[in-house]
Amino acid sequence: MLRAIPGVGDAILLKLVHAFGAPDAVLSAPQSALEEIGCRPPLVEAIRRGPAPDAIRELDKESEQLQRRKVTVLTYLDAQYPAPLRTIPDPPPLLYVQGSLLETDRHAVAIVGTRKVSAAGRIVAEELARDLAKMGFTIVSGLARGVDAAAH
């Protein structure tokens, strides 16, 4: 829900959640508390307003699509969130998981690229992902269109 607020990107989202403990606590935080952690007035106002109705509808549609594709969303706060990712300087606040996370997923590779992939590029991404998966690598992707989607 916080990502639907203008001005809240990944880094700010993590900062807010670290400060307040949970997304709901951020949305109900007093103005003074938001200012204390360094939020500027326009961001404080945006957080206090919450996401716009259009943004909420988009999130609902995205949630339905993820359910249809059997994708689980893990947040940085979830116990299943991979421990190695917690140690990097700018960890993703959300992970989209198809299938299940296993101990063997420590050997993972991300396949990313353009959203406007050519037919040849799509084939290369698909074959690369398939070959790496056969070798025991977990394929990681942001689920964006193009190369990312082809990798899955």
Question: What label would you give each PLM region?
Answer:
Residues 1-134:
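Short, positively charged patches
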Residues 129-152:
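Phosphate/pyrophosphate-binding betaalpha-module
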